[in-house]
């Protein structure tokens, strides 16, 4: 579950930065999101490979290991769609949970 929260937070940050002329890239870090460097890099690489983000350069470390270098990170249309779908799903979940809380026999 923590991975999906991190994915959502990274995409939200990149979406927010679309409106900034000079984004604070220090916030795009493991330290900012309070996760390990290893987890952060892994999630960033997955987001890139899935087409949710762009603007990073992959650096092969040998074998299946990669690092990345941010060039001009940005959210893609696919990343925006992910945010929209997950925001809608959260709203639907809250609505259904609220209905269940009000009418416990249903």
Functional labels for PLM-detected ranges:
Residues 11-17, 47, 83-86:
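Generic structural signal for hydrophobic core residues of well-folded globular domains
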Residues 99-106:
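Short acidic DE-rich linear segments
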Residues 2-32:
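Short amphipathic alpha-helical interface segments
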Residues 62, 66-98:
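Short, amphipathic alpha-helical interaction segments positioned at domain boundaries
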Residues 25-30, 59-66:
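Short, surface-exposed loop/turn segments at secondary-structure junctions
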Residues 3-4, 21-22, 37, 89, ...:
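Alpha-helix N-cap/helix-initiation sites
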Residues 4-8, 38-41, 50, 73, ...:
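Non-catalytic, well-ordered alpha-helical scaffold segments
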Residues 34-58, 69-70:
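Short amphipathic alpha-helical interaction segments
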């Amino acid at each position: 579950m923590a991975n999906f929260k991190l994915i959502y937070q990274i995409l939200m940050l990149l979406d927010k930065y679309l409106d900034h002329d000079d984004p604070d890239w220090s916030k795009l870090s493991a330290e900012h999101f309070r996760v390990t460097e290893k987890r952060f890099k892994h999630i960033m690489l997955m987001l890139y490979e899935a087409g949710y983000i762009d603007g990073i350069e992959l650096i092969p470390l040998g074998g299946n290991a990669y690092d990345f270098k941010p060039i001009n990170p940005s959210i893609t249309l696919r990343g925006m769609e992910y945010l929209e779908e997950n925001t809608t799903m959260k709203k639907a979940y809250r609505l259904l949970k609220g209905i269940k809380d009000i009418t416990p026999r249903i």
